[in-house]
Amino acid sequence: MTASSSGCGGLPVSQCPSYSSLSKLFFMDSSYDSYYCEEPEERQTASIRERKRMCSINVAFIELRNYIPTFPYEKRLSKIDTLNLAIAYINMLDDVLRTPEDSGQYIQKCVHMARTGQIGAPAWSTSDLLARLNWIKWRRLGIEPIA
């Protein structure tokens, strides 16, 4: 197939709509030696799929934000902040489950190590998570506040 061959619903590529912006519409065929213009229906279907995909990703981020500690004044965390906080929070919860120590004492020890710059503090204790943990109303949860 050449640039003048059919590829746009039977039309020659040179007569495809938006010929001036073909770089956005061209895709290589399986032989990688010729180009064709994508059908409008296929493009529309692909756009719908992409919108659905982005919508499901956004819904997943909204759900994830419900499970990580946030500041009361924050409207919404960015996606990267959400992921970083989720990773730190999961690591903290994993450490709490694995330690033979009392959970509250273990967290207080880790927080103290991080605040005093001691080597050996868990990676999650140096993250933004510590600042957020200070906003939690621990007494309402029946837990002594983290010092």
Swiss-Prot record:
Superkingdom, natural source = Eukaryota
Q: Which GO terms describe its cellular component?
A: cytoplasm; nucleus
Q: Start and end of every bHLH domain? A: 41-93
State the Gene Ontology terms under molecular function.
DNA-binding transcription factor activity, RNA polymerase II-specific; DNA-binding transcription factor binding; protein dimerization activity; RNA polymerase II transcription regulatory region sequence-specific DNA binding
Which keywords accompany this UniProt record?
Cytoplasm, Developmental protein, Differentiation, DNA-binding, Nucleus, Transcription, Transcription regulation
Q: Which GO terms describe its biological process?
A: cell differentiation; dauer exit; developmental process; regulation of transcription by RNA polymerase II; response to oxidative stress
- List the subcellular locations: Nucleus; Cytoplasm
Answer yes or no on keyword tRNA-binding. no
Gene3D superfamilies for the chain: Helix-loop-helix DNA-binding domain (4.10.280.10)
- UniProt-listed PROSITE patterns: BHLH (PS50888)
Induction, per UniProt:
Induced by daf-16.
| Protein name, UniProt field | Helix-loop-helix protein 13
Gene that encodes the chain:
hlh-13
